[in-house]
Amino acid sequence: MSLFYRAVALGTLSALVWYSTSILAEINENSCSSSSVDHEDCEEPDEIVREEQDYRALLAFSLVICGTLLVTCVI
């Protein structure tokens, strides 16, 4: 494969990893289990918010897996 395609694949994978870690960091920041949250003021998210967080975490994980497969196929 061309060096260009390898660079594009690795760049895509690094962008997907960055995006997914930012999603997971945002979810962790909003959770009550985070050490930076004052537990007295913490409210558990309702079911809709929890489902959205689960969906976003699954999306982030899927993006990293697909990106890894892409890089594996290209390289």
From Swiss-Prot:
Residues 1-25 form the signal peptide. The chain crosses the membrane at residues 55-75. Keywords: Host endoplasmic reticulum, Host membrane, Host-virus interaction, Inhibition of host innate immune response by virus, Membrane, Signal, Transmembrane, Transmembrane helix, Viral immunoevasion. The keyword Acyltransferase does not apply. Coiled coil: none annotated. The keyword Cell membrane does not apply. One of its GO terms (biological process) is symbiont-mediated suppression of host innate immune response. One of its GO terms (cellular component) is membrane. It is found in: Host endoplasmic reticulum membrane. Plays a role in the down-regulation of the host NKG2D ligand MICA by targeting ER-resident MICA to proteasomal degradation prior to the GPI-anchoring step. In turn, MICA reduction diminishes NK-cell killing of HCMV-infected cells. This is Uncharacterized protein UL147A. It comes from Human cytomegalovirus (strain Merlin) (HHV-5). The gene is UL147A.
